[in-house]
Amino acid sequence: MALAACVSTQGPVQQAIRRIDPAYVAMYGPRPDEPHPLPATDISEVDPRFLRREVAYYGREEPGTIVVDTESRYLYLVREGGRAIRYGIGVGKEGLAWSGRARIGRKATWPRWTPTAAMIRREPERNARWAGGMEGGLNNPLGARALYLYNNGVDTMYRLHGTTEPWSIGQSVSSGCIRLFNQDIIDLYSRVPVGSPVVVLRGQRLFDVEDETRVSSAY
């Protein structure tokens, strides 16, 4: 099942947030230094638990490992000393989500996107015109960066990538890939080398509810 296209068709979820921490306004602010100058991400309708933060980490994975908890909609980059950077994510729809162990096989800045044949068949009016590929840019579904997941040296066709749909973070909407805010994928990209291990969990939470409360309050 190849789902490299990583696009979604679900509309935004309206979840108003009255106040935004100025630190987060800066964190998700514009990036004019990018090859395609990146505007600020509107986080006013994003559940604040999906905004990037450092947390206590009680998992067993080694530092440098990326752990994707699809049930909780979090991605963790494990650090030393029982800590991790936690990012909010959007994940694949039920029946399309991928899970397992992989490694970062390659990395790309403002990556090119090509819809798969299956994606074109499902939504020809949306995807057929890009059968030859779409160059990187602000309208590209992969966003500002992409990390390509490989298993035993073989491309799994799944990516950790940015998004043109920031409202989708925290939701189950994409076609199998794992999406982050563009500012977050830029941050993650800068921290992980090719070869970094990735664990994608499905059907289970990395932490139980009590542990998640402890993790979130540890920031």
Enumerate the language-model features and the residues they cover.
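N-terminal pre-domains immediately preceding structured catalytic cores
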Residues: 1-178, 182-219
